[in-house]
Regions:
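Short, well-ordered alpha-helix to beta-strand connector turns
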Residues: 35, 86-88, 108, 133
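A short, histidine- and acid-enriched strand-loop-helix "catalytic/donor-clamping" loop
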Residues: 10-12, 98, 111-128
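Membrane-proximal helix-turn-helix segments that form the acceptor-binding/catalytic region
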Residues: 26-29, 84, 123-134
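Active-site proximal beta-strand in glycosyltransferases
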Residues: 3, 89-91, 104-121
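Short, charged/polar "capping" segments at the starts of alpha-helices
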Residues: 46-51, 121-123
Length: 134
C-alpha cells in the first residue's frame, strides 16, 4: 500500500536541515519500516524540489515541496493529480483545512484524515470552529 502524507498547512518545514519533531516525517518513517512505501507533500514558497529522507533499513521517503495557493492558513495544491494517482492512500491532516475536504470529496475511496478536533478549554474560537466543521 503506497501512502502519500499531504500537509495542507502553509509553513515551510525544511527536511534538508532537520527532521526532528516533524510529525509527518516520523509517521512516514514508521510506515516505511512496516513495509508501506510512504512519501510526503509539503508546501513551499521557495523552489519546488524533491528531497530524499533516509530511513534506516528501508527505502527512503520522498518529500515533495510544491507551490500552492494560500488563503486563511489553507494551502490549495493545484495540478497534483498525477502525483495523487501514484498512491493508494492520501493521508491528510487538519480536518478543517479546505484541501482536506477537497481530497475527501474527489478521492473518497483513498483519503484518510488523520487528525481531528481537540477541545481546548482556553480557546473558545477554536471550539466554535470545531462545531462548524463537525
Amino acid at each position: 500500500m503506497k501512502i502519500l502524507i499531504v500537509r495542507p498547512w502553509p509553513s515551510v518545514l525544511d527536511v534538508t536541515k532537520n527532521t526532528y519533531n516533524i510529525q509527518e516525517v516520523g509517521l512516514a518513517k514508521a510506515l516505511v519500516k512496516r513495509g508501506h512505501p510512504t512519501d510526503i507533500l509539503f508546501w513551499t514558497d521557495g523552489d519546488e524540489m524533491t528531497v530524499k529522507v533516509g530511513v534506516e533499513g528501508a527505502k527512503p521517503i520522498h518529500v515533495f515541496y510544491r507551490h500552492g495557493k494560500v488563503l486563511l492558513k489553507n494551502v490549495w495544491f493545484k495540478g497534483q493529480e498525477k502525483l495523487f494517482a501514484r498512491y493508494d492512500v492520501l493521508q491528510t491532516a487538519e480536518y478543517n483545512q479546505m484541501f482536506s475536504w477537497h481530497l475527501a470529496g474527489k478521492y473518497p475511496e483513498k483519503t484518510v484524515v488523520y487528525h481531528g478536533p481537540y477541545y481546548s478549554p482556553f480557546n473558545k474560537n477554536y471550539n466554535r470552529m470545531c462545531r462548524v466543521f463537525d
